[in-house]
Amino acid sequence: MLSRSCTLFLGTLLCSSVSFGQTESTAPLNLTLATPVDSVRFQNHRYNEFYRANRDFSYISPNGELGAPSKYVINGELIASYFLLASPKSRLSIAVTQRFMARTRTDRSSPIRTPSFRLGTQVFYRLSSNVTRYRYVEAQFFHHSNGQDGDTFRPNGTYNTETGDFSTNYIQATYNWGTHFSQRHGAYYNLGYRWHAPIFNSSEGLTGHYGFGRVLGQATYRLLARTQPEPVSTVTTERMRVTLQASYAVNQLDGWSLTAAQRRLNVELSVWYIPAFSRDAGIFATAGYYGEDPYNIYFNDRYAFVRLGIAAGFTRYTDELRK
């Protein structure tokens, strides 16, 4: 039962990551050589690639978060973005995004129990005409739920992590900037704020215990390479990425001061590598600390962890435009 469940979960997550995370058609595309880099069409085209490249990766991780209070068989997250507007004619882009995180426990029958579902919209707007030193802003609105509707608390007053309801809605705004030098390297940074606004519905028992307001930031360095020697190829792909992500809860938390980093800080350092023989999948290693576990109703868990596995979603940059 355990082997069969793991195989099914692993295969589904990997196939979905490649098929939907990139949302690329396999049909022949009508392409034309890119216009000069100072053209508006090329600027919008390149920024649409930045929006995709700077997303989080889908991943699968055998044994999940090593160091977590619970033991896992395999964990993973599937991230799929469907760009409704991503035209070379517009500096505005809009995507509908779904994020599905599942942790398969080592308990009898390997239950997943309370997976995390996040469904929302992302809006991107280009601020600069520079494609080597870029700047843009992003706004998000997401609904986050664990798909349960049971009582949030057990009779003894503790959180019901098996069937307890967890849901919240948040808006997020970030300022994003970075560098991109084809065939060599690039960097990406962002600063922003996530707010679980009280005007939206959320589950009971979260006020004073959950990070409703978070300052967040990210720093990324990536190595790039042509897929083939010039002048044959106009495509550049990532070979390695190093990412530092951090967020800090700034709202009132009962029993915790504003400087209590052990409860308010989430931080992750990840190294990602894509082999030359792979199109968009690679391996990764992450070390981090959760002062608030992002896995829905398990938010009270605090722990340091290591995560190893396979990731999908590396972006390829092209100097060709769709007609």
What is each PLM-predicted segment?
Residues 34-54, 87-263, 291-292, 301-304:
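Outer-membrane pore/translocation modules
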Residues 1-40, 318-323:
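Cleavable N-terminal export/targeting peptides
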Residues 23-84, 311-315:
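Short glycine/proline- and aromatic-enriched beta-strand/turn motifs that initiate or cap beta-hairpins
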Residues 76-82, 122-126, 268-270:
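Short alpha-helical segments and helix-capping/turn motifs at coil-helix boundaries
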Residues 25, 253-255, 260-323:
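Predominantly the C-terminal beta-signal and adjacent terminal strand-loop region
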